[in-house]
Amino acid sequence: MKFGFYSCMSGMPWGGSEVLWARTARLLQLDGYEVTANYKWWAYKAEPLAHLEKHGATVCYRDKPAKPLLKRIFSSNGAKQNWLESERPDAVLVTLGYHPDQILIADECRRLGIPYGINIQCASNFFFIHSDRLDDYRQWYRDAERVFFVSEENQLKLENNIAMKFENAEIIANPFNVDFDAAPAWPSTSDGFRIALVGRVHFQSKGHDIIVDVMKQEKWRKRNLKVCFYGHDQGNKRQLTELIKMHQLEDQMEFVGYSDKVESIWEDNHALLLPSRYEGAPLVVIEAMLCNRIAITTAIGRNRELIDDNESGFIASGATIDLLDDALERAWEKRDQWEQMGQLAGEHIRQRYPKDPIREFADKITSLAKAPAVG
């Protein structure tokens, strides 16, 4: 049996939205299934794709740069065959990094009678589908055997966006990058409290700019609290570092850079600060809670499902200066309880989140192949 994985990722060579399908594909290989994938061509090949190919997967790279005319005419390969027609997978998973992504591959699945599922990694209220395209989007989702969301909040956003109830929806979990039983030591508070924003430096989604506006207030300047930023630059590192300098916040804020050592981050920090404007289900919240740290975050994605406000973390009802300031103020008032609250967060996340999301999702993908053909 063969499973196909189609990624709509087009803005960068790799991203967090790709982790679930790639790890699931690898697990299916280990289970003895064949795997084929369709991914946008980049000059840089992401390591997970190379890993799948090394273990026998066929990967079709679409949108390759056009060859010179003579080379195209005399190419021994000729025109590339349609991916689905040549590979004939028994089922296909289509992954969207963001809800506006078009799902044209669904039309081909329907034409060939191949059952498919759709996984939406992030939906927001920042982009609404134009009414001229509603029928297309509704058809793509309606014909899917299953539509997988990473949070109930994201499902509601997309239902409102295209004015359609998803009768075929299911909530799934993304994999995390820390041991399920992680227990990094609680850092000393003798030099004050350190809170970390872990995530790409992208103001539009992560809200770094909101943190600057909160921390530049006089009351926060006087408090023994430091915000540390961890993550890759995705377009706004320069603004972040220059805002810190502009407001003379060098003592209160620091850009640390990217680190893949999750437990080490939480050995140095007491809490997560994440004022996201939109998310699917932020893994950094799950990882912080698994490391027995509280999260101070917004009511987006899966956060309300995982965090009990004022008990195992602090939730701002929206990504605004005033609302984040309120949540951070509530947290600061209980700063001497953060360690105990973090322990409670660790207990809650282990009760509310699966230990092995990849195995659970792999089982759902294999069930797609047993579904009636679409079309």
Where are these regions (language model features)?
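A conserved mid-protein helix/loop that constitutes part of the nucleotide-sugar donor-binding site
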Residues: G15-R23, F193, H202-Q217, D322
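Glycosyltransferase donor-sugar binding loop
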Residues: A37-K45, V198-G199, K226-Q239
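A short, active-site helix/loop in glycosyltransferases that binds the activated sugar's phosphate group
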Residues: R142-N168, F176-V178
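Nucleotide-activated donor-binding/catalytic signature segment of Leloir-type glycosyltransferases, i.e.
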Residues: L240-G257
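Aromatic "clamp/platform" in nucleotide-sugar-dependent glycosyltransferases that forms part
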Residues: Y258, R277
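Short hydrophobic beta-strand element within catalytic cores of glycosyltransferases
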Residues: I294-T297, I307
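Conserved acidic donor-binding segment of nucleotide-sugar-dependent glycosyltransferases
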Residues: D308-N310, F314-D322, R330-R335
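A short, well-ordered alpha-helix in the C-terminal region of glycosyltransferases
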Residues: L323, R330, Q337-R352, D363
